[in-house]
Amino acid sequence: MSFVHLQVHSGYSLLNSAAAVEELVSEADRLGYASLALTDDHVMYGAIQFYKACKARGINPIIGLTASVFTDDSELEAYPLVLLAKSNTGYQNLLKISSVLQSKSKGGLKPKWLHSYREGIIAITPGEKGYIETLLEGGLFEQAAQASLEFQSIFGKGAFYFSYQPFKGNQVLSEQILKLSEETGIPVTATGDVHYIRKEDKAAYRCLKAIKAGEKLTDAPAEDLPDLDLKPLEEMQNIYREHPEALQASVEIAEQCRVDVSLGQTRLPSFPTPDGTSADDYLTDICMEGLRSRFGKPDERYLRRLQYELDVIKRMKFSDYFLIVWDFMKHAHEKGIVTGPGRGSAAGSLVAYVLYITDVDPIKHHLLFERFLNPERVSMPDIDIDFPDTRRDEVIQYVQQKYGAMHVAQIITFGTLAAKAALRDVGRVFGVSPKEADQLAKLIPSRPGMTLDEARQQSPQLDKRLRESSLLQQVYSIARKIEGLPRHASTHAAGVVLSEEPLTDVVPLQEGHEGIYLTQYAMDHLEDLGLLKMDFLGLRNLTLIESITSMIEKEENIKIDLSSISYSDDKTFSLLSKGDTTGIFQLESAGMRSVLKRLKPSGLEDIVAVNALYRPGPMENIPLFIDRKHGRAPVHYPHEDLRSILEDTYGVIVYQEQIMMIASRMAGFSLGEADLLRRAVSKKKKEILDRERSHFVEGCLKKEYSVDTANEVYDLIVKFANYGFNRSHAVAYSMIGCQLAYLKAHYPLYFMCGLLTSVIGNEDKISQYLYEAKGSGIRILPPSVNKSSFPFTVENGSVRYSLRAIKSVGVSAVKDIYKARKEKPFEDLFDFCFRVPSKSVNRKMLEALIFSGAMDEFGQNRATLLASIDVALEHAELFAADDDQMGLFLDESFSIKPKYVETEELPLVDLLAFEKETLGIYFSNHPLSAFRKQLTAQGAVSILQAQRAVKRQLSLGVLLSKIKTIRTKTGQNMAFLTLSDETGEMEAVVFPEQFRQLSPVLREGALLFTAGKCEVRQDKIQFIMSRAELLEDMDAEKAPSVYIKIESSQHSQEILAKIKRILLEHKGETGVYLYYERQKQTIKLPESFHINADHQVLYRLKELLGQKNVVLKQW
């Protein structure tokens, strides 16, 4: 007797199953099952993955779900019911049932809906905890019989079954079900109620249940859970040996269930054109209109290219798609929403350019349409659009309103139990302390996709910890079993689907955000179904551009059209050449700054190339690219015929489009064929490489190139196929970078205001940008209750600090402050508390405003303001309570105010600490400032100077603001530090050998005199600390000195005069010794020749006398 599992939960029943879909189907195949069902709780998240996996193994997929169903319209109680799709109609009804359960009626399905969606569905009671089972266990047999017949009347005879599960040990219930079946004539079927795959996975399942409940295993009641594994046929035959008809019923049900999900077809929606015009004709009309708008009277190249692209688009039936995108982009522009110049290969389309979907002229920038839409490789077009992250939702709302709520949805994504999360979660339910679980998780290398098995192999320390503890070994073992399972559902950052038919005919939906549904299928499975997917991306840099340009327009009455700026502007490229790129899209990293300083870019083309090259692999070509640009290395072309293709990149292959053009030029490939070649060779499979080599060489020979030349060029194509970057994307994103650089170069104050406002809430970034602003000469004004706004603002040639950037001052409080001061400025603390609504004024907020300096203008010291808070609040409360009566007698000139509670100002160290706490930065001063003269005398440089002197040994005076100690793989301690001074912040690292010596002085808040050097690591400047001592322990005898050796050949009046001039130009506190080689004599120079021993003076002396002849000795 055969059997089919009809009640199966996968990991998509979130935290209620330890069975991954692929593994579930693989095990069913191994056990020889011909059919298998999937019946997750309320959802169909895994349906397509399950369907494909079953089809791939020749198993009949039975798609179902477990629905909660209300017993009546009162909606008081809902009970589970297993529903299986018999047919495509049944599958579509399941889509609707799941959508209802996940959006309109999360508690359960109303009887009327169950009746509406019953067609094509087989229903099975769950075996326990269902409505029928609950009635039977309550002794209500007759009611159970009545309810059973009602269910049968809904689904039809032969489409409603009782689940019979004797293996769960409830003998009384099992006998009652058999009796009920006999009395009602409704058949029983065997079901397994699968929640995990193998019996040894039971502990993992119990663990998941505890994670879901937020309990520890020791707290949960000890349940004698039945085995809920995917039992083999032999075991099921043994369980049901006395009732083989139940096994047979499962097979009969499976034979009825035949669903055919259409995969691979395209479901492009149609665009509602005016007057019934065809989409092809309408697209042509608006493209011609756009071409004239862009170019006036375009030349023949543009007309030919446009006609070619339109022909391809029409032939591939994508006219509606372009019209849909054109329409919502048009709406965005009409609403003043900034849109990106393009993203990905879409920037290579002239149609997209003339429709104002992109802002990149593909002919001017040598971009290829075939890289976007290849007529020789049919695939869905993919236009990703960037919007400001604050306005992206407006565009999605427009699309939903135009096409209807049931035709537009955002896309689901799943957070999984990755290695670290699995270890932490399992550790918690096993009672491992959070600290220990965290320490264990931190031993897992931080790399995307890292598995627990890989982590144990790569981390000897993790392996050691696990071997030392049987409890941790158990935690690890179970974490491995649940690793990779979905933990929660969330919304994809960008994806939106659009459908001609109601989405619930194709995909189950669930509640989303802002009234927009969320698909239950993830992106890959939506593509399998042929749904049109578009990416609406929120780009912070566009928000920044929008913010800066609107400020300039509002304050300066200058409307900036970034589409018409010069991409060779001297001021812009001077800024870029200095590496002054903080806040500049994709050009901010330390490594990129270094490249820009060496490259000295002179136009957009250089930035495009750098963005394309600055990646692992292509990076190795950057030095050659720079040397060729500046004429320090000859430009070599693989063949002279390739000069026009490679001359912009000085003979270096940088872009995928160059590979395509080379194949077209030399081998006569169409650009479509060239794109196929590029894709093929990038896979690096030998048989494909050999086949394509023959194809390429054959084409070259037809065009009379030699075999050697053809092979040489093909080898280059193979080498760069993986390295080559999408030029269309590089051009578009480089334009955003150049636009921001233009704004920074020409409107630095507005740029800095916009940049600072964009990172409100991120203390580290605000701190970094404020230090940079001060370093570049921009004055930052303190926060002020009378002058500050929500954003950072420009005020009299300076930047005024934002109120919202003060900790504990929320959005509503800022609004209330702004509204209250509109009539007149606040006069004092009492006036402030009286006029700002009491819902916003509380002690915490007032303390934050006072500590930050936002109330300094009231003319009292901060300690006095703090001491007067209670009086001010009581005064405001008293007058607010009597406001109606007092208002009859008070006028503007009459006021009763209490007096300040005057007290001495707080010590400077406390004032600064409170400033740092509320602003994230030492604003008015820095704790180190009191030591600056002493530090300079000791030869210490600032953090800003140190960051500009990479790889040089330096001394610094710093405040240690953060310390993070870790253990290396070999079990040694080391530390990562955050250091600061008046000029900025910097990360530092203390390796194990140094940590052993320095750990006594490494504590947060310590003021240190330290030595080491800066290095660029992982694209960040990091200080490698070699020595450190507390500033308070500094010894005057350790004062540094500069030793200058004057070789015999240098002993001349001219050289001595130059030395004297350099010393006098860099006066300071560091002593200078001269050693005359000829006389073998050392002379200590008088104080009048003491210098500020920074890297600038040392560089000048070394340049004059030689590297080895100038030494700064310290410690």
From Swiss-Prot:
Its main location: cytoplasm. GO terms for cellular component: cytoplasm; nucleoid. One of its GO terms (biological process) is DNA replication. Pfam families: DNA_pol3_alpha, DNA_pol3_finger, HHH_6, PHP, tRNA_anti-codon. One of its GO terms (molecular function) is 3'-5' exonuclease activity. The keyword RNA-binding does not apply. This is DNA polymerase III subunit alpha. It comes from Bacillus subtilis (strain 168).
